[in-house]
Amino acid sequence: MSPAPPPCGFAEAESTNTKSAPKFRSACNACHEVKLKCLGGQPCARCRNKQVECVYSHAARIGKPKGSRNKKTLERLRQAKAMSRPEETQGEETTSLTAVDASQAINCRALSGSTRRDSSPLPPPHSDTDSAEGGAEEELLDQEERDEAEKPPLVENPPNLNPLEQISPPREDFLDLLAHSSLLNNTQHDLQHPTADMVPDGLAGFPHASTSAADDLSWMTSPTKSLLSTTFPAIEDDLQDLQDPFLCSSWRSACLPPSSSRSSFHFPRFNHFAEDTMGLEYASGMDATRSLGDPPHAMARAGSFSTSGPGSSQEGSHFLSSRHSQSSGMYQPVPKRPSCSCLKLQASALCRIHLVDRSHADMRGDTVLATASTILDSCNALILCPSCATDYKFLLLAIMTVRILLCWLRGLSATRTQNDNANMKLTLGEYEISGEEEAIIKNMLVSRALEKVKIAVRRLRERVNSITIQEVGNCSESTQRWDLTYIRMCLDHMEKQVGC
């Protein structure tokens, strides 16, 4: 027989004890410290093998205890309660209406409903079911009317706003303006005056400057005048001034281009201002383009400018002189360094050496002598140039070319090939030089070229010795010192070769 189950009360007490009892770790302390899997048991296999005490500690609870809240959560709940309290009080104030207001609203609704029922046609006959449904609908309608009566009444016209009828323009003036559409219809005027495309759309119907003063206001009708005077009160004085023929012609010429010049507008009201300050015009578009150079050149072209108006020549000259005196302190010509072709000569010499070195396997005497003449000429030009002789870049290029030339001349004087002797024929007029005389002349030419190289190396040494270390541009003193040391090493090596 199976044992009898424990009493109900004892089972509940045992379950509560098991729930509240702390749990132990699945691994013992020794295995947990070394992070190894514990097989369990008391003691476990690892503790039994090492003869270590096997102890199981309570499992640490992860996270916060139940029921605890963060400070931010409590603050957020407090703010939510504080925000909900004024809304509740405001809702209570809006919903609490007096009995008198509610009764008045219900009476108004009832009167309006009775008038609607009296004015509406009689409904068709209906059955009992229809009457029952109608009663339910009436109850719903009454409930809706009571709900609407409880709402505060809406203000139809706020006190600070005008009705729509006061804002909209009067219909008579608008139709009158549309009736006189001659202002917009300018087809005939376009045929007579082709320059009407340059005028804005609102001025397309204005008369041209060539018309007489008698029909100055013929284009403006009385409804248009009245509409302009009511809409813009300040323009009424201008309309009165337009009756004067002189003022009307001036205003017309200010709005439209004159017949004599179709390419630019003319403003007679600003003639005095234009003559005093900006009355100068360019004689042609090319002068305007060329005058954008340096200020002295632009001022030298003052004779090509043309002026218009009485006394404009004196005022224009005074304007030019004042502008030139003001700009003389602001714009100063920047002094330019003297231009030279040293860099171009050095680069050409280096390219020539490169081409000769690639095109000839065995250097011929005539080719070496011709190349030597070009290289030595560029080197002498660099030494004599006052602005480039102290630049390390140019000196390095010159030393590079002279070193290559020196190697060619030494090789040409040391070895003589059969191909060289066969191709190099020396003649003096009709006399052909050969044998010992030919060798003497060739040695003399090579020695003369070596002497020129020796002179060039000596001049380069003098130029390098005169250079002082100083900061120039973005080049540091250490970089200049290193370049100067390398240049001196190359010159020492070449001096040993030529025997300086």
From Swiss-Prot:
Compositional bias (Low complexity): 154-165, 317-328
Chief location category: nucleus
Keyword DNA-binding: yes
Domain of life: Eukaryota
Gene3D superfamilies listed in its UniProt record: Zn(2)-C6 fungal-type DNA-binding domain (4.10.240.10)
Effect of gene knockout: Leads to reduced production of sirodesmin PL and decreased transcription of sirodesmin PL biosynthetic genes.
Any single biological process term in GO: positive regulation of transcription by RNA polymerase II
Record field: compositional bias (Polar residues): 304-316
GO cellular component annotations of the record: nucleus
Pfam families reported for this sequence: Zn_clus
Keywords on record: DNA-binding, Metal-binding, Nucleus, Transcription, Transcription regulation, Virulence
Molecular-function GO term, any one: DNA-binding transcription factor activity, RNA polymerase II-specific
Basic and acidic residues bias: start-end ranges: 79-88
Biased composition (Acidic residues): 135-147
UniProt region (Disordered), positions on chain: 79-168, 302-332
Entry protein name: C6 finger domain transcription factor sirZ
Species name: Leptosphaeria maculans
Gene behind the chain: sirZ
